[in-house]
Amino acid sequence: MSANEYLKLADDVALEIAEGRLRPGERLPPQRSFAYQRGIAASTATRVYAELLRRGLVVGEVGRGTYVSGQSRRGA
């Protein structure tokens, strides 16, 4: 997988959020499940989730999971 592939995957999830397929407060799958579903390494899934967090699209709650943020920062 190329170094920027995680950015494309993050863009894909961001589009799902923008289009309303993932709604505020909705829980994303655990990173390992996300990796399995997308056919990627767990480390790549970790990078995708970190990028979504950096963009303000998701929030992580230790022991509870990762959720779509109530407000997104478009263009971040």
Task: Outline where the language-model segments fall.
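N-terminal basic, amphipathic alpha-helical segments
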Residues: 1-76
